[in-house]
A protein has these predicted regions:
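Feature recognizes metal-dependent phosphohydrolase scaffolds
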Residues: 1-423
């Protein structure tokens, strides 16, 4: 969404992720975005990019030259990403992320960086576009490249159509039929209290935080192109993606830089928000539902974002059935971790049903062996009493419509509203 709004830093993050996990066909074929300028810039700028070899690239699909070019493109956009993130962090001290401008913390004399008091040697020391005096400043070539990419993303008709659908149909959270749905987490302090965020010179937490985030996101698309509100909304979309304890991210920080440049595995750890220490407790889930105005005894929280590690014995139901985790789905990078290809939750008048899916074997094998995605119902949780239409959100709307129609009919019958007859 941030990329579609024209945010250069979000575009860099999108391209970084697509290259890392070999999803560039989505960008080029799906959305018709031309990456030739990036390829030309990368091939002319970088020599060594072995550390940026795509994580899940298929050797059968690419030649060694293709992989070499992809690696250089990957490195080029990563360096641009780190520069733009450093600039954004400097613009917004209220995000409390000054320690995450890692490019500015590199000691370019001996090519080391100190994190949490420990000095680490960098695994890649080639930085032809980085000025040690101004590490986050883009070169003129990088600026030209990003202008082209911003124009391409903003003028992709299909991408804009898809993001418009998300804006008009989606939200930060949804209360539906006494269920609370959200993607990441409701940020908490270590003691379990709601974490406060200072945004626009005001403090927000819990439901108020989600409501305010929703407003800021929409400003990134609905205001004038060069307005300060739009610029803040674009930066805030990046914060939601990977900002400290963001409700959509739910971690202290993202370790993209460390995974590329530092060997020590302890630096790759992304500490989760305290929410994940409490979301298995039934009492906490009941209180969280109340925070969003839901008190029904059958209410559930439907929580995304965190993969369910089935191979380690984890399951999608937590807190005595008050919370359902539905995530870690069709993303190939997670399937080796989870052991499955995600879950689907079905909600009906009888209760909920959760199906687990096995990874897709691929088009060739499907056609050869006439196989499909294998799914199995793993959980059934029936309600004590069947839910009738009148008790659902749709039923409540129908009741309101009936009351309005009856009031209108009464107004006509009593003469409050005169009927007009056409001759």
């Amino acid at each position: 969404m941030g990329a579609a709004s024209g945010s250069a830093v979000c575009i860099a993050n999108v391209l970084n992720n697509c290259m890392r996990y070999d999803n560039l066909d989505v960008i080029e074929d799906g959305y018709g975005i031309n990456l030739l300028p990036l390829a030309l810039f990368a091939s002319q700028t970088y020599e060594n990019a072995e550390r940026f070899r795509p994580k899940s690239v298929s050797i059968d699909s690419y030649s060694s030259k293709d992989i070499d070019l992809l690696s250089k493109m990957h490195k080029a956009i990563c360096i641009i990403q780190f520069k733009l993130e450093g600039q954004l962090i400097a613009r917004h001290p209220e995000f409390n992320m000054g320690d995450r401008d890692l490019l500015s913390q590199i000691n370019f004399k001996d090519m080391t960086i100190t994190i949490d008091g420990t000095e680490h040697y960098l695994l890649d020391t080639e930085f032809p576009t980085v000025d040690p005096e101004e590490p986050t400043k883009l070169t003129s070539e990088e600026e030209k490249l990003m202008k082209k990419l911003v124009h391409a993303f903003m003028n992709s008709e299909k991408l804009q159509k898809h993001i418009h659908f998300l804006l008009t149909s989606g939200s930060m959270y949804l209360c539906f039929n006494d269920n609370l749905l959200f993607h990441g987490c409701v940020p908490l302090n270590e003691d379990g209290s709601l974490m406060e965020f200072k945004l626009n010179n005001a403090l927000f937490k819990g439901k108020e935080l989600f409501d305010h985030c929703d407003k800021i996101v929409r400003r990134a698309f609905s205001t004038d192109q060069n307005s300060s509100k739009k610029a803040y909304g674009q930066d805030f979309l990046w914060f939601l993606w990977c900002g400290r304890n963001s409700p959509l991210f739910g971690r202290d920080h993202i370790t993209t830089f460390e995974r590329y440049f530092i060997a020590a595995p302890e630096t790759h750890n992304e500490q989760k928000n305290a929410y994940y220490q409490y979301y298995s407790e039934e009492k906490f889930c009941i209180e969280l539902l109340k925070e969003f105005g839901i008190t029904n005894k059958n209410a559930k929280i439907v929580n995304g974002h965190i993969p369910v590690r089935v191979r380690n014995g984890e399951g999608p139901l937590k807190a005595n059935g008050k919370l359902v985790v539905i995530d870690g789905g069709f993303c190939k990078a997670y399937q080796s971790v989870t052991g499955i290809a995600g879950y689907t939750m079905f909600f009906s008048s009888h209760g909920i049903r959760i199906s687990a899916h096995q990874p897709w074997c691929g088009l060739e094998e499907s056609l050869k062996d006439n196989t499909d995605i294998s799914s199995e119902t793993v959980i059934r949780d029936n309600f004590p009493e069947r839910i009738l239409v009148g008790s659902t959100d749709t039923g409540k709307i129908l009741k309101e419509n009936i009351e309005e129609l009856e009031a209108l009919l009464t107004a006509y019958r009593t003469g409050v509203l005169p009927q007009i007859y056409k001759k």
